[in-house]
Amino acid sequence: MNARSLPSAWLFTFGLLALALSGCHTSDFPQYPPNYREYAYVTNGGSGTVSVIDVVNVRLDRDLAVGQNPVAVAASPTRNEVFVVNSGTRDGVGSISVIDAEHNKVVATIPLHRQPVSIDLDPAGNIAYVANSGSNSVSVVDLKARREIARFGVGEEPVAARISADSKTLVVANRRGNSVTVIDPATGRIRAVFGGCPGAADPVILPDSSKAFIPCSAGHQVMVISLAGKQGNTAQPDRLETLMDVGRGPVHLALKPDGGEIFVSNSLSDSVSEVYNTTDEVGDTYMIGNDPVRGLVSRDNSLLYVANFRSQYLTVYSIDDGRRLGSVHVGDGSSAMAFSAAGHLLFVVDTRSGDVAVVRTAAAYRSLFTVIPTGRAPNAIVDKAFKMP
């Protein structure tokens, strides 16, 4: 049910909840300087819009019209800009909408190719890599010049392209090709292609750029690739390390901020598997919720939050204790999450109900704070914090 159609009693209850919490328990909320700004940007695939949430005041700021079917979003780490990938129609071309975060308006549109579906930025925030699922390619976009500067051919239906922290490796998951393409982004040369990963999905690259992990979403495994580099004075090529057995339908990998374990959301097994990335071993598997589709680890590496698409509950799991702490009621069809910059709020995107559930993360108050309506079929979110000059 869409939040806009909730009965008035529900909306009144949400309002009282927000007022009560804000008035009585605000010790976990930061004190912001006057020039501080923070916004969460939510792509609404069914509306062709981006909902801008004012994080400081925890309210909807505005809706921005972007391109058709926005599906992904990224924030510049160095400039006050946000980039929205518009997938477009099935047979048409997509684009990137550039949002000026200081004024929250669209300032440019960068044309792409057929059905772009993901975006990743290099550490400097100057180059974007966009997977074009309908063109079997990856676009390389100069974000300062606001134009495509290269295009790499990859496998069939690429769904994600991730750049390593050292910017020396681009890892592309080809869903329909059941494969992973490894590219030298400086030259566009394909270094390796690894098959045998049914429904290859969004990769994770370790912070030291040594390994890539790719969930095989149409199977029950995670592919582990050792990325090219030097061991002593010897150059090592990209190589397949192993295929690890996890649950059925692994769709998302959540890496701890410290680069330690990885948590695999097994959507068809209703479970999460813990992976030790140094040894390529699968530890325990935990029953977690109905159709877990995304995980997010807290900044202190202690908690795992899991969005369950079919249960309307967010699961909270203690990594240190190895146990489920409980759950928080959110909206329908939870599909994406993002922390506020201070980590005191977790924004949960609810695709079916068309809203964002705002959850307080402090142990004393861990609960739903409020619900913010968005456009139709929201699907991705990013947080951007900065100080005005």
Question: Which residue stretches match the model-derived regions?
Answer:
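Bacterial N-terminal signal peptides that target proteins for export
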Residues: 2-12
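Intrinsically disordered, low-complexity regions enriched in Ser/Pro/Gly/Gln/His and often acidic
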Residues: 2-3, 17, 208, 258
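Predominantly soluble domains enriched in secretory-pathway, periplasmic, or organellar proteins
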Residues: 24-389
